[in-house]
Each structure stands twice: as structure tokens, then as C-alpha cells.
């Protein structure tokens, strides 16, 4: 039996680049031995120009209704939680927060894919310009500082080609900020499985120096992503090599509404 029993990073077809029905995703996780499953699809982002990789705002109500019903149906077999993966865009983050106040969102994870709501720079590809990495780290730290996120997803998504030494000071300050704020760093199974260049030993050796806490995230975009126990175990073993604590719980809330 693999050690991958909790996962808070699961997508749905609403994000336009995942497959499978909601029920199929929950069933696949259950069949794989996952005991606690968090659904965290790419959040609608009112005001953002980049909408092709996230659900539309009008789909949010159905998202919560569907998984609320599945939570009841699967009760006693798998513990189901409903949240979102979101990005931090300073110019429209308050608008997103106000939008989410109307829904029973239990948690947010921070996954910074773009440099702005206009989608000017996509961080998922290796780059040659260290200033791109610096901006990514700036946004990730600012997002973590809002206090609304449970953890930082694929923290090493933005990465340099070739010589990694220029990346070190930026990865170092990212890891230090996460530790100071008490937020885990995700070891991303999607990147591990597809050999995307992350999770990277370079980044997590820096996390090891800093003494960060880790969390495993499937980043599942298909029910099939839960289907290979050998991959789940290999990712678990890879994360364990750094000797850092790996958490299996995150804080939940009943609403994002500010008091």
C-alpha cells in the first residue's frame, strides 16, 4: 500500500484541460486508497483576461452542488472537501475574494501560473531570464502573505534553464517566506509523473536547508492519475529523501467571508 492517502489538489473538467466526471474522480481516488480528498479546481477569476484554463464564474454554483452531493453519497468511505486552486493577482484579488464569499469554499491553495490577470507570462515553462523567476517569487510570497492560502502548490513551477545558481537566492527567499508563514510546500505528483522538470531536487534541497514542511499533491486532471500505485509510491519515496516533515492535513474554513 502506498503512502499517498490524502490529496487536496484535484481538478475537474470545468477547468477546460481536465477530463472525467466528478463522480469518476472521487471513485478513482477512493479506489487508489485515498482517504481524504480535496477538490481544488482552478478558481473562476472575475476580472482576469485569461479564462481558458479555469472554470467560468457561472459554473461555481454547480461545482459546489455536485461535490456536496458526492460528499453525502461517499460519506464513510472517503472524506471529501471542496476548495479552489487560485492565483494571486494584486489588481483583482479582492474581487476574487468577494466572489468566493458567496460559496462554502473550505480552502484555497496557491498555484501561480501567470504573471498577471492578463496572462503576460506563463510560468510553467523553463525560462532564461532570472527576472521572470524573481517576479514569480514576489507574487507567490505576496499571495502567501494574504493568509488565505493553505499551502503553495508546485512551488518550483517557474524554473531556469541551464545554470541553476542564479535561481538560488529567489528559491531561498521563497522557502524562507513559506516557513515563516507556516505554509507547506507541495511536492507535485503531476510534474513528477510526467517528468516536467518539477518537483526538482535543486529546489527541495534548498527547502531542506531552510527546514520547510512538505505536502504531497496529486494535481489530478484525470481519474487515471490515481490509477498507478507505483507512481504514487515513487513520488512519496522521492519526497521522503529530504527528511522534511510531510503533513497530511490542512486547515479548513466554512467561508472566506471576512468578519
State where each predicted segment sits.
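Well-ordered, non-membrane alpha-helical segments in soluble/globular domains
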Residues: 59-67, 133-137, 232
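An N-terminally biased module of ancient metal coordination in phosphate/nucleic-acid-related enzymes
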Residues: 1-90, 161-175, 182, 189, ...
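Mid-to-C-terminal alpha-helical segments outside catalytic/metal-binding sites
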Residues: 229-259
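Domain-core and long-helix interface of multi-subunit machines
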Residues: 16, 109-210
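Hydrophobic alpha-helical segments and helix pairs
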Residues: 78-123
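Short amphipathic alpha-helices and their capping/turn segments at secondary-structure boundaries
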Residues: 22-35, 91-105, 136-146, 173-176, ...
Amino acid at each position: 500500500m502506498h503512502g499517498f492517502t490524502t490529496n487536496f489538489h484535484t481538478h475537474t473538467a470545468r477547468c477546460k484541460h481536465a477530463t472525467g466526471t466528478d463522480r469518476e474522480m472521487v471513485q478513482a481516488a477512493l479506489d487508489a486508497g485515498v482517504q481524504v480528498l480535496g477538490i481544488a479546481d482552478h478558481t473562476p477569476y472575475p476580472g482576469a483576461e485569461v479564462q481558458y484554463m479555469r472554470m467560468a464564474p457561472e459554473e461555481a454554483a454547480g461545482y459546489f452542488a455536485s461535490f456536496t452531493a458526492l460528499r453525502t453519497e461517499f460519506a464513510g468511505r472517503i472524506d471529501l472537501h471542496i476548495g479552489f486552486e487560485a492565483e494571486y493577482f494584486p489588481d483583482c484579488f479582492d474581487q476574487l475574494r468577494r466572489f468566493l464569499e458567496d460559496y462554502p469554499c473550505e480552502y484555497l491553495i496557491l498555484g501561480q501560473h501567470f504573471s498577471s490577470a492578463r496572462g503576460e507570462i506563463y510560468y510553467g515553462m523553463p525560462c532564461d531570464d532570472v527576472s521572470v523567476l524573481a517576479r514569480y517569487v514576489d507574487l507567490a510570497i505576496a499571495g502567501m502573505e494574504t493568509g488565505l492560502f493553505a499551502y503553495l502548490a508546485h512551488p518550483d513551477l517557474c524554473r531556469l534553464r541551464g545554470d541553476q545558481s542564479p535561481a538560488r537566492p529567489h528559491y531561498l527567499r521563497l522557502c524562507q517566506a513559506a516557513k515563516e508563514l507556516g505554509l507547506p510546500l507541495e511536492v507535485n505528483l503531476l510534474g513528477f509523473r510526467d517528468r516536467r522538470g518539477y518537483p526538482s531536487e535543486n529546489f527541495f534541497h534548498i527547502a531542506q536547508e531552510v527546514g520547510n514542511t512538505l505536502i504531497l499533491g496529486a494535481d489530478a486532471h484525470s481519474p487515471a492519475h490515481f490509477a498507478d500505485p507505483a507512481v504514487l509510491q515513487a513520488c512519496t519515496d522521492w519526497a521522503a529523501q529530504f527528511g522534511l516533515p510531510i503533513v497530511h492535513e490542512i486547515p479548513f474554513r466554512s467561508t472566506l467571508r471576512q468578519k
